[in-house]
Amino acid sequence: MATMLKLLALTLAISESAIGAVMHPPGNSHPGTHMGTTNNTHCGADFCTWWHDSGEINTQTPVQPGNVRQSHKYSVQVSLAGTNNFHDSFVYESIPRNGNGRIYAPTDPPNSNTLDSSVDDGISIEPSIGLNMAWSQFEYSHDVDVKILATDGSSLGSPSDVVIRPVSISYAISQSDDGGIVIRVPADANGRKFSVEFKTDLYTFLSDGNEYVTSGGSVVGVEPTNALVIFASPFLPSGMIPHMTPDNTQTMTPGPINNGDWGAKSILYFPPGVYWMNQDQSGNSGKLGSNHIRLNSNTYWVYLAPGAYVKGAIEYFTKQNFYATGHGILSGENYVYQANAGDNYIAVKSDSTSLRMWWHNNLGGGQTWYCVGPTINAPPFNTMDFNGNSGISSQISDYKQVGAFFFQTDGPEIYPNSVVHDVFWHVNDDAIKIYYSGASVSRATIWKCHNDPIIQMGWTSRDISGVTIDTLNVIHTRYIKSETVVPSAIIGASPFYASGMSPDSRKSISMTVSNVVCEGLCPSLFRITPLQNYKNFVVKNVAFPDGLQTNSIGTGESIIPAASGLTMGLNISNWTVGGQKVTMENFQANSLGQFNIDGSYWGEWQIS
C-alpha cells in the first residue's frame, strides 16, 4: 500500500509538472510582508500561470529563506486573447547584490560592507537609484492578452507611453479600464520574450568616462528603473520532460536542502515550491550561500517544474548526456560575488573554482547538455562552464537570465556544434561566447550592462569556422568607458588573457553575423584585438536605429589596430546608423560609421 501511495503521489506531481504549477495569486500587501493567497491562477492546454504564496515585497534586504522576492511595482495577469478573463501570473523581482550589500563571505551578514574597497563587483550607482528587474513567466499555446497593473493602483499611462523591446517585433497595446496596459501576445512555437518599458520610468545613465555620475558627463544608456520582462514560453516538448518513476526519480520537498537530499537517482525533480541550500559542505546549518548541489554521478537530468524556485547551483558528474529542463528558476541570490566554492564560497575570484550556476568539471567526452526552459537569476560569476574534455556540445533554447548585475555574469559557454535559440540574457560580461566552431545562435535578445562585448571571440588565438549568429536583438547597453581589453562593442575580441603569448598567423576566425538590431544609443560595432587572421567574416543587415554614441568618451568608435602578419577579411553589408547606410564613403572614424581600422588592412575588407 505504501508503495502504491508513493507512486500515486509521484504521478500527481509529474502531472502537475507537465502542465505547470497552480499556486496563489495576490491579495493586499505592503512592503516587507507576504502577499495574500486568493487563488486566481489558470493552468490548461491554452496557457498556464502560477503563484508563490511566499512572495515577499522587499526592495532593500535579503528575503527570508523560504520566500521569493516579489515585484513591488507590477502585477501581471494573463487571459486567452479577447475573452477578458484574466488570471494572475507571479511577478518576480531581482535587486543589485540581492539586498546583501558588499559582502566578502556568506557568513558576514548582517554586516554588509565587508568586501574590500579595492574589489569592483560591477555595481556602483544601481542600488542608490533603486534599479531593479522584475519578470513574469508563463506557458502558452494560444494567443493571449497580458495585462500589467501597478501594485499601488495608479495608472500606467496610455499605450503611447509604452515601448516594448525588442522594437523589431511589434505588439498590439491597449489600455484597460482599471488603468493597466494590455499586450496581445500571439501564439508562437518559439515563445516570446520582451521588455515592457514606460516612458515615465526611465533612468538616464551618465558617465564621465570613468564612472557613472549623477550630473554632467555624457549619456551612455537609458534603462527602466523598474524593469519588467515577460517570458511567454511554449509548453515543453515531450522529449524534454523526463519519464519519471519512483525508481528513477528523486523528488525534492520544498524547503531547506540538506547535504545528500538530492539522492543518487537518474532524475532530480523539483516540484513547485521554494528551496534553498541549508548546510555548508560539513553539514553545518546556518548561513546561506555556503554550498551548492553536487549531483551523484548517476544523476543526469535536473527537472525544474513551473513554480519551482531553487536558491542554489547545480554541478553534474555524469558521463552521459545531461539535462536541465522545465520552466522553474535557479537563483544565485544567496551567493556573494565570485563565490569561490574551493574556499568557503568567499568573494575571491578563481577561474577554476568560483561558482557557476551550471557546472561540470569531470566530462567524459562525447556528451551533450540539453537546456530547455529554465530561468537563472542573480548569478554570482560565470554562469556555465563544463570542463575535463573537449568533446562537449549543448542544445539551449527558451533559456532566460535575469538579475545579472555583478561583473563576470556572462552567457553560457557555446561549445563546438552547439545550437542556441530563443534566449533572453541579461549580462554584465561576454554575452555570446564564440570560442569554438560549428555553433549556431539564433533569435537571441541581449540586455547588456557595462562590461565586455555582446559577441566575444578573443582572449587567445582561435581557429573557428562554421559559426552563424542570426537575429540578434541588443535592447540595452550602458558602457561606462571606451574599452578594448574588455571591448565596449557589439562584436569584440579581447587581447590575450595569459601573458607571453603572440598572435598565430596559422589560425583564422570565420563566421556570419546577420540581422542585428541595437536599440538606444549604440556602442561601436567592432572592437577587435587581432590574435589570428579573420577570414570570410561576414556581417550583414545591421541596424542602429537610434544611432551610434557620439560622445567624447568615444564608445561609438570601432577600433581594429594593426597586427603584423595577420589579415582582416571583413565583409560588412547593409549596416545602417539612424536609418542612413554606412558605405566606403562615410565609414571613417569622424563620419557616420566611426569605423577606425588600421590602414595596413586596406583592400582586405569592405563595407557595402
Swiss-Prot record:
This is Dextranase. The keyword Glycoprotein applies. Residues 1-19 form the signal peptide. It catalyses: Endohydrolysis of (1->6)-alpha-D-glucosidic linkages in dextran. Residues 20-34 form a propeptide. N-glycosylated. It is an enzyme of class 3 (hydrolase). Glycans are attached at N39, N571, N574. SUPFAM superfamilies: Dextranase, N-terminal domain (SSF101596), Pectin lyase-like (SSF51126). Belongs to the glycosyl hydrolase 49 family. The lineage of its organism: Eukaryota, Fungi, Dikarya, Ascomycota, Pezizomycotina. Its main location: secreted. Its EC number is 3.2.1.11. It comes from Talaromyces minioluteus. It is found in: Secreted. Keywords: Glycoprotein, Glycosidase, Hydrolase, Secreted, Signal. GO terms for cellular component: extracellular region. GO terms for molecular function: dextranase activity. The gene is DEX.
